[in-house]
Amino acid sequence: MNLSVNRCITGGFVGGFSSCRLNHEKRWVRAGKHCELERERSLVSDAVSLERLESKSIKLAMLASGLGVANLVTLSSAKAADLKMIVLDQATSIYILAEGSLGDSVGNFLYSANQQANEAVQDQLSALSVTSLAVIFGAGLVTSLSPCTLSVLPLTLGYIGAFGSGKSRGQVIGDTVAFALGLATTLALLGIVASFAGKAYGQIGQGLPVAASGLAIVMGLNLLEIIELQLPSFFNNFDPRAAAANFPSSVQAYLAGLTFALAASPCSTPVLATLLGYVATSRDPVIGGSLLLTYTTGYVAPLIVAASFAGALQSLLSLRKVSAWINPISGALLLGGGLYTFLDRLFPAATMVM
């Protein structure tokens, strides 16, 4: 038994469990209050490893999100009912895939809550008011607790934990607010783009949605590791955080939030799809940006709360074990959604029967 083990054993037991554990250097240390430095090192190491592991997933998810928006904003108003059914089908797939880790009762509850939130948003969109904004904000809160969002949560918290290491609670909260503002900005811009794209729908034609569906299928097969897809060198070499390394930490967090919003936007279904569909129909950039900003404020509120509790961040980082499922789940959703929309463009009567 080496010296580090002997010293650790002299500390006895804490809470009925041995106070000894291996640190990242494979040395035995006490797990008491004198090991805060070891915890910080472990937290940063976990965050860095997770970021490297999911780098390709983020970039592919960014492209996938853009394709999803392209499909949404080019839907005609006559297909509003079809859009709702497609969205609900995709949402059902997400929850079925995630229920295994959360339990049937919790999964069913969250799925039901998201359905009710989506219905409440649809009711409010018929006559906008201050109450409508409150309902949309609440829908953002509910959506942030969905199983799909939980699968992306370790990635988000890993980044927050990385830029929060060694800082005071106030600094961590400030950076998290900047990160959340980046998320909100991206989704608000999606609303504005959707409104302008809705105006130009008559000039777009059917070629873009078909091409977008085909690319979604290819990307889904790549995430499932069925085919190999080489990203352009720009995506392989460009790192937005490295490009912003000379900026203050709050600016870096804001720029990172802009990127993470695209990776997390598929998890906002069906509420986000409902809002984007409405904005594309209303064709009002001000309303579009306001609705998406309100929704995103509710969506990111739990992140700000989580950043207020350092212990919560460390415990939530243990959810990184589910990150191995992000690629296959995203690939299955991309493949299924791409096939459905592709067939819908070519054989609309057949997809109506489905």
From Swiss-Prot:
Knockout or disruption consequences: High chlorophyll fluorescence and deficiency in the accumulation of the cytochrome b6f complex subunits. Dwarf due to very slow growth and pale green leaves.
Listed GO CC annotations: chloroplast thylakoid membrane; plastid thylakoid membrane
UniProtKB keywords: Chloroplast, Cytochrome c-type biogenesis, Electron transport, Membrane, Plastid, Thylakoid, Transmembrane, Transmembrane helix, Transport
Compartments reported by the entry: Plastid, Chloroplast thylakoid membrane
Transmembrane segments: 135-157, 177-197, 207-227, 260-280, 286-306, 322-342
Record GO biological process: cytochrome b6f complex assembly
Principal subcellular localization: plastid
Top-level taxon: Eukaryota
Topological domain ranges for the Lumenal, thylakoid compartment: 1-134, 198-206, 281-285, 343-354
Topology class, membrane: Multi-pass membrane protein
Stromal-side positions: 158-176, 228-259, 307-321
UniProt function note: Required for the transfer of reducing equivalents from stroma to thylakoid lumen. Involved in the biogenesis of the plastid cytochrome b6f complex by probably transferring reducing equivalents from stromal m-type thioredoxin (Trx-m) to the lumenal thioredoxin HCF164.
Family: Belongs to the DsbD family.
Name of the featured protein: Cytochrome c-type biogenesis ccda-like chloroplastic protein
Organism, scientific name: Arabidopsis thaliana (Mouse-ear cress)
